[in-house]
């Protein structure tokens, strides 16, 4: 069985802790900034810049876990712990699975935002 794209308990806890309105502002900010985080990962991978790669993966991981995007967070954590020179390829696009999962997360967060 696949894990849900967004862990609803984590997302609801965020809303309870911060208030629904602020949680939705955080969602909007994440949806605006996450593509830059993914671009930073791609750029760092292309440049073999280990420090930038680790920082970008860490930022993505932390943000994902805040919203309950646990699968994407785990993928980012795996990248954070993997040296940039050891990132496995995937048909020449090693970050494609991460980008695909982000697309699912963005769609799920957008749907939750409009509930």
Language-model features, listed with the residues they occupy:
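Two-component system phosphorelay core
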Residues: 1-115
């Amino acid at each position: 069985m696949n894990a849900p794209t967004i862990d609803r308990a984590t997302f609801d806890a965020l809303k309870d802790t911060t208030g629904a309105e602020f949680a939705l502002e955080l969602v909007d900010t994440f949806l605006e900034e996450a593509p830059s985080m993914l671009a930073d990962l791609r750029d760092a991978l292309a440049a073999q810049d280990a420090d930038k790669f680790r920082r970008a993966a860490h930022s993505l991981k932390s943000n994902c876990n805040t919203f309950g995007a646990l699968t994407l967070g785990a993928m980012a954590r795996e990248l954070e712990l993997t040296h940039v020179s050891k990132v496995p390829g995937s048909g020449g696009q090693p970050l494609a699975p991460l980008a695909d999962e982000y697309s699912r997360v963005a769609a799920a967060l957008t749907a939750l935002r409009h509930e």
